[in-house]
Amino acid sequence: MSDRGNVRIALKVDVDTHDGLARGVPAIAELLARCGVSASFFIACGPDRMGRRIARLLDPRFGAKLLRTRAVAVYGWRTLLSGTLLPSRPVATAFPDALRRLAAAGHEVAVHGYDHARWQDRLPRLSEAQVRAEVTRATTVLRGILGTDPRGFAAPGWRCTPASLAAVDAAGFAYRSDTRGSYPYLPAAAGQVFRAPEIPTTLPTLDEVYGRAARRPAELADYYVGLLRPDALNVHTIHAELEGGPYVGVLDTLLARLRRRACFVRLCDEAASLATTRLPICAVREGRVPGRAMPVALQGQESPARE
């Protein structure tokens, strides 16, 4: 990144757990307020059952990531056992006032699925009716808290299928942020082009690069600044449990580097501008990204323009 002010960046804050909303979101919101920055917060709207993911320790890639990012320090045993040895706890409905405060402060509050662990681990095995129910329940919860229809949907774990793409369209969302990619597009899968535009995450997440690209906050900030593209919308997904927890210093340092050089946008505002844009059609495919244990949905090959 070179010239000051020529870079657009959207901060996408994924809130996966009860403690992420209870502790991580206030810490991130405080930092954003101090910097005068607005962000898009995507909230898991159902139960926190992250403990059910503990079975993935059998996957050496998952176990290595947990060790590299100090998962016990990040999440705590209460979250790591939630929904297994310990009862699950609600996420969105446990802190409705916190979500209203985010909206009142000018942040976008949007949907990050209902049962995050179920979606991330089982989505390909869910029926179309089950997928629709996940989307509908999440939307109903957030609408009940905010009194307005959420405009955006972000798939937990960047997992999506033709059934989930169709369910998001059917629910009336203005846009989605389900995949990893390079630029906004209309997603296509199973011979169908879907209505709601996709605004993909373009930058790697902290848990993917920590201990691989760098460790110190200043080094990580430099790493991210070096990845920014002045000719595109840069979407950086952060997690309430990480950047709002033990790694809050990384976010603080990054914001300090960016606040005078970048224009921050909310994803909902970007989606509104896309409404008048002829977007390319790109296939959605499954693949892997460095540093992440599970496969994710990726922006695939661009299709010929429609007449």
Task: Cite the ranges covered by each PLM segment.
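Catalytic alpha-helical scaffold of carbohydrate-active enzymes acting on polysaccharides/glycoconjugates
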Residues: 1-152, 157-197, 215-236, 243-307
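Positively charged, amphipathic and often flexible ligand-engagement surfaces
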Residues: 198-212
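Short, glycine-/Ser/Thr-/acidic-enriched flexible segments
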Residues: 204, 241-243
